[in-house]
Curated annotation (Swiss-Prot):
Mn(2+) binds at D102, D104, H212. Belongs to the glycosyltransferase 8 family. Glycogenin subfamily. UDP-alpha-D-glucose binds at residues 9, 11-12, 15, 77, 86, 102-104, 133-134, 160, 163-164, 215, 218. This is Glycogenin-1.
Length: 333
């Protein structure tokens, strides 16, 4: 159907690799809808050409250069730059209905049935289930909604500093108004939830349709060995106990995306065991993009509690299983 589309966003070349894997996985599972990627000016011309080979439409979005109220909002709320770029998805009025998907998601089966849902349909956020996670949602493009979201961003900002807080404020009735707008968790399975609720994953994980790689470390931050078809993980990494989705992401990348990057000169040498820090370097263990963000400064107990309540627990660091167990042991002795 040409009036419906899957939409994603990339704000740099690292996330563009995620978008390429997402777009490839949608095509692999034979979607009948169009695929669209919003790209900011930070995406290189070479990477944009690769995006054009996978997506039906590549739309450049520059909030700083826009003539609408998005520019004014950015001047007032500079911290919402990426959020305001994402909100542009509501301006795609050439489509009657869309499904937005973050670039760190991977499609595991055909999900065209999502277009039977109404705005705003989304899955619960694992950190605070009365809020929806904005990594996958069904929406209806509308200039009126777009302008109202910009006004809300300008006047109130976002309670979590990103698009999820803003969208949950705007669509505040999601939790209680209409249960049909609650997507099953399998449409937005958080990779961190596998670690935090393993019994449920063992019972229902086989039904997953979309996996969402939440957290600071993204699939492209890992190192992959094409010979063993496995990702190299640190022993304390939560994903190490169930790396199948991560390996699947990399399999999709090496099969469908890597040849395109090579063809466009973004990868010079894709040998069997290389290391690459930048997009155009030599490779060994396949490792693309930027390193994971540097460790955050230590937080107070109140700040950590606040992050937990916002679904931002540091599962890789202070809030790791080992640290939580160690703390519990001190009380149980």
């Amino acid at each position: 159907m040409t009036d419906q589309a899957f939409v994603t966003l990339t704000t740099n070349d690292a996330y563009a690799k995620g978008a390429l894997v997402l777009g490839s996985s949608l095509k692999q599972h034979r979607t009948t809808r169009r695929t669209v990627v919003l790209a900011s000016p930070q995406v290189s011309d070479s990477m944009r050409k690769v995006l054009e080979t996978v997506f039906d439409e590549v739309i450049m979005v520059d909030v700083l250069d826009s003539g609408d109220s998005a520019h004014l909002t950015l001047m007032k709320r500079p911290e919402l730059g990426i959020t305001l770029t994402k909100l542009h998805c509501w301006s795609l009025t050439q489509y009657s209905k869309c499904v937005f998907m973050d670039a760190d998601t991977l499609v595991l089966s055909n999900i065209d049935d999502l277009f039977e849902r109404e705005e705003l349909s989304a899955a619960p956020d694992p950190g605070w289930p009365d809020c929806f996670n904005s990594g996958v949602f069904v929406y209806q493009p509308s200039i009126e909604t777009y302008n109202q979201l910009l006004h809300l961003a300008s006047e109130q900002g976002s309670f979590d500093g990103g698009d999820q807080g803003l969208l949950n404020t705007y669509f505040s009735g999601w939790a209680t108004t209409d249960i049909t707008k609650h997507l099953p968790f399998v449409y937005n399975l958080s990779s961190l939830s596998i670690y935090s609720y393993l019994p449920a994953f063992k019972a229902f994980g086989k039904n997953a349709k979309v996996v969402h790689f939440l957290g600071r470390t993204k699939p492209w931050n890992y190192t992959y060995n094409p010979q063993t078809k496995s990702v190299k993980c640190e022993s304390q990494d939560p994903i190490v106990s169930h790396p199948e989705f991560l390996n699947l992401w990399w399999d999709t990348f090496t099969t469908n995306v890597l040849p395109l990057l090579q063809h466009h000169g973004l990868v010079k040498d894709a040998g069997s065991y290389l290391m690459m820090e930048h997009v155009t370097g030599a490779l060994s263990d396949l490792s693309f993009g930027e390193a994971p963000p540097a460790s955050q400064p230590s937080l107070s107990s109140e700040e950590r509690k606040e992050r937990w309540e916002q679904g931002q627990a540091d599962y890789m660091g202070a809030d790791s299983f080992d640290n939580i167990k160690r703390k519990l042991d001190t009380y149980l002795q």
